[in-house]
UniProtKB/Swiss-Prot annotation:
One of its GO terms (biological process) is DNA replication. It comes from Clostridium perfringens (strain 13 / Type A). Component of a cohesin-like complex composed of ScpA, ScpB and the Smc homodimer, in which ScpA and ScpB bind to the head domain of Smc. The presence of the three proteins is required for the association of the complex with DNA. NCBIfam families: PRK00104.1-3. It comes from the Bacteria. This is Segregation and condensation protein A.
């Protein structure tokens, strides 16, 4: 007769093993049958020793705690103090176990998010060679702070995300499909038609988030070149782009 093959899960710690046993026995964390869990817990530790696996002091401490709770539950209740001590010990264990379960769930979510970053691709930086006058007048940012621009960008991402299916991603995006130089010329053309325009007007025309970002960067580049200024006529109002008229 062949010996059964025993597979031992690689547990992250004593709480991980305890959660496994609770799930296996279909128990609730708040209604653990200590006598059943303790027996199985000790069997797992014994199996670890047989397989020459490293057993940390944390596993031993947890086993001792379970044995203590079990022994106190079997002994006659002579004093009320002992009963309180037993209940407190078990309560502390349950609270720690529930807290561990929460962190385990969060770590699994973060691991999933980390893996999903592999689906994100960035565009190479586009070098724009131009002579820039670094002496910008404050009037180019009339009633607008960097925080306002940051909020504008986040709002644009949110608005675009609500109108598009964010779960659908293009398999291939050409590096030269959205260029800052093209968007600069696009904004120049629009400002030649109207001297003042709302930046948000251009977002519905964008095909993807990358195009929104490139358009936003084109606006910043035009501000840097002193060709436009951005204005906010009221608190929390829309950010307007205004063409700068150069006096000849």
């Amino acid at each position: 007769m062949e010996m059964p093959i025993i597979k031992l899960k690689n547990f992250d710690g004593p709480f991980d093993l305890l959660l496994h046993l609770i799930k296996k026995n279909e128990m609730s964390i708040t209604e653990i049958k200590i006598h059943e869990i303790t027996k199985q817990y000790l069997e797992y530790i014994a199996l670890m020793k047989e397989l020459d696996l490293e057993i940390t002091s944390e596993f031993i401490v947890m086993a001792a705690t379970l044995i203590e709770i079990k022994s106190k539950s079997l002994l006659p209740k002579v004093k009320v103090e002992d009963e309180t001590c037993e209940e407190d010990l078990q309560k502390i264990l349950m609270e720690k176990l529930q807290e561990y379960k929460k962190f385990k769930k969060i770590s699994a979510y973060l691991r999933e998010r980390e893996l999903s970053t592999g689906e994100v691709f960035t565009k190479k930086a586009e070098i724009i060679e131009v002579e820039v006058d670094n002496k910008l007048d404050d009037d180019y940012f009339k009633n607008i702070t960097m925080l306002d621009l940051y909020k504008l960008y986040n709002n644009l991402m949110r608005i675009y995300g609500e109108k598009q299916n964010v779960n659908v991603m293009e398999k291939k995006i050409s590096v030269d499909k959205y260029k800052i130089t093209d968007k600069i010329n696009f904004l120049r053309d629009k400002l030649s038609e109207k001297s003042i325009v709302r930046f948000s007007e251009f977002i519905p025309q964008c095909e993807c988030k990358l195009e929104v970002v490139v358009t936003f960067m084109a606006m910043l580049e035009l501000i840097k070149r002193s060709e436009i200024k951005v204005v906010q006529y009221e608190n929390f109002g829309e950010i307007m782009m205004e063409k700068v008229i150069v006096n000849e």
